[in-house]
Amino acid sequence: MIPQSNPTAQRRSGDAQNTNNVAPNSVATTTDTALTASTQSGSSSNNANKKLEYIGVYKIGPEIGKGSFATVYKCIDTTNNKAVAIKSVYRSKLKSKKLLENLEIEIQILKSMKHPHIVGLLDYKQTTSYFHLVMDYCSMGDLSYFIRRRNNLVKSHPVISSLLHCYPSPEGSHGLNEVLVLHFLRQLSSALQFLRDKSLVHRDIKPQNLLLCPPVHSKQEFIDGEFVGMWELPILKIADFGFARFLPSTSMAETLCGSPLYMAPEILRYEKYNAKADLWSVGAVLYEMTVGKPPFKAGNHIELLKNIEKANDKIKFPSAAQVPEPLKQLIRSLLKYNPTERISFNEFFNDSLITCDLDDNDQPLETSQMDENLFISEYISPIAPAERSQFFKEQKKNDSVVRSPSPTTATTATPRQDNVVQQMTKITSPVPDDFALSIARNSSEFNLKKDDMNLEKDYVVVEKRAVEVNALADELAHAGAGADAIPNSRKNSDVDQTNRLASSQQQTETASYRRSSSSGSQKRPSFSERRISLSLSPTNALTKAIGLASNRLFGLTTNSSHSNVSAIAEDDDSSTSNNDASSFSTVIPSTNNHVLLQKLNLATIGEPGTEFDLGSVSNLDEQILDKLELIANIANAVNLYADVKFSQIIPSPPSSDGIEDDTEMLPPKIIHMISQEGIGLYIKTLSLLGRAMDIAGQWWFEKYDAVHGERPSFETTVRINQIVQWIREKYNISLERLEFLKSKSDFTAEETIEDNEPNGTTRVQQAIFAAALGIARETALKELLRNSTDIECSYVTSIYMLLAILEDLEESDRQEVKKIIEKINSRLKNFMGK
């Protein structure tokens, strides 16, 4: 699989479409070092232009897509000055025969694909470090980006503005206009029929792999290019054939691949499947086009399969989507659980919705102001770095709108104690008050290891990583290395009890934020009532969440896990209002953390290196295990903070009469702000979890895939697999919550997007930094006031949160954060030594 980022880089130009001059054995004229410099650049666009780097005759432009194995660049063909997309695949990442085979098959398939609705391979070059696939450039991005961001793009993209003016979505619907749906369906079916004639199954059809190009300039050009649909509308093309296979109608496959949300149930069941799996994916994509979201969602593929089975082939459509009955029937015939009951390809291709004539209005869209070389995401202009610090200053003044002073400041301690507390908090974090602002001011100069300055791009990367994360976890589990395969002191009846508790929590919170239950529910609190819980500062909310989850952070023995959780919950209920209790119950992670750290490694935690150094461990497998445990705990700390944001947005069950007063909803600006903060935190969590999976994957390859690999110890294998399974579950749950927050953010973005909205990475860095300091300060207060509850856990969590941002900082800021970590660690050691 060669993941591509959303929106992936490609744009079909009229001249390039007819060239298709594939040169499989040609070699790039530049050195690998030149491209590597461009790849590692914090701003690939500027560096590429300044250094005038080339791949053959192609001038390297800005990075517009990124995955685990490849980076996509917008480039210029200097022979005709046309834009192309170059997908540069890292040779070093393709360490197994299967990955190399996927790439070779993708290249072979693309070389034979010459169809107007399939992304064409124009050229192919390779160097000692990269495979370069030169492909059509689709400047309008992908279908997923178009569906989710059209309310923002309509203000700045001339073609989309004209398109949605002519074909608006139904009022109250998040889906597309019926005409657009049928137009894209016609083009998708044309490409699928071409693949079917060649006995090809794509196996990864999803909105992210359906790319869009601007409309052609005339009806005659449309006819000459053999396009289908309406000539005045955008052109859809299928991309990313990394999973595709030549699969005759009598053949079956059994490889788990593709995006789970659009994956056929027979693939989710690990059963053999045929080309009909693509038809399920088409039905899922068609549903998303009409409704605005996938037909089924879940935190992992197991839950997804359960949801599909539970639906029992009953596909429901929101009334606001106004989906016509023939379209509903087609979608339902595609989304049949049993592939034998699913509509056949011939029936699909001959459906009246596909064969009927679409009425062209012969009125072209407004394209005069469109730059065809400009990528779609570039139409949403980023904030200028100089304006970021101003935003944060203004945000400080406006914080009172959402947050009230910390309840800790209302202590009843004596004046003398107050003075001591103030001194201690200053000692605990002796950092200049403007340190956080220095992070914002210098954000554009951070030495980031990847260009994650755009949260939208990062979201797509982590979304695509979900397939790899689940595949690796499945491989380890099925190899007999799983905890279920051997006896373990931690796997006993108490663990089962803890798992049941975690499962119960997950079911409760899932039912809550999906509004799946309305019986016996209370009316949603008004905004003034909800402000009570929202006014808690993130620090206080996070501290409370940490207290509730302390047994999981420390990996307490399973004998006491259940009782501790119950005791904490009872104590919390007795000290807070019902409203607060219900609010924070959703913060508790539903996964079971008993596989995590059994030790704190305090001797090394105070001197973290840029690569999360763990000190000297003689055994390489133990080093891998310790590194995985540390990164998993760092990710878990950030995830706790993200869950706080999620709990503030999560919807309450509807009232018994099914009526909600619009005045009782949170203002869109606040929803958008909290959602954006949560999105950034979840993306940071997912990037850390993905990093841990990369380490585990490398270990797995060296120990099992390599011919002369030395087998690890039995116990180490089990422990690493336990962490991998925990990471997989945490990754899937975090990704689902991220998608939920994105839906909230996208829905409110039209009313709240402002030019001075801060950079996404800056916002995340500041939020984590401020929360970590806040936890440390409040923990010092609790320690001074002889309140020893969760002191150890809170200090360690603040350290983990600071470690999460350490690598992304430039050297001067990194040294300041290290000093803070050392101070907190010193206080932790003193407390533990008492």
Swiss-Prot record:
It is found in: Cytoplasm; Preautophagosomal structure membrane. Belongs to the protein kinase superfamily. Ser/Thr protein kinase family. APG1/unc-51/ULK1 subfamily. The lineage of its organism: Eukaryota, Fungi, Dikarya, Ascomycota, Saccharomycotina. It comes from Candida albicans (strain SC5314 / ATCC MYA-2876) (Yeast). The gene is ATG1. Residues 401-416, 513-525 have a biased composition (Low complexity). The active site is at 204 (proton acceptor). This is Serine/threonine-protein kinase ATG1. ATP binds at residues 64-72, 87. Its main location: cytoplasm.
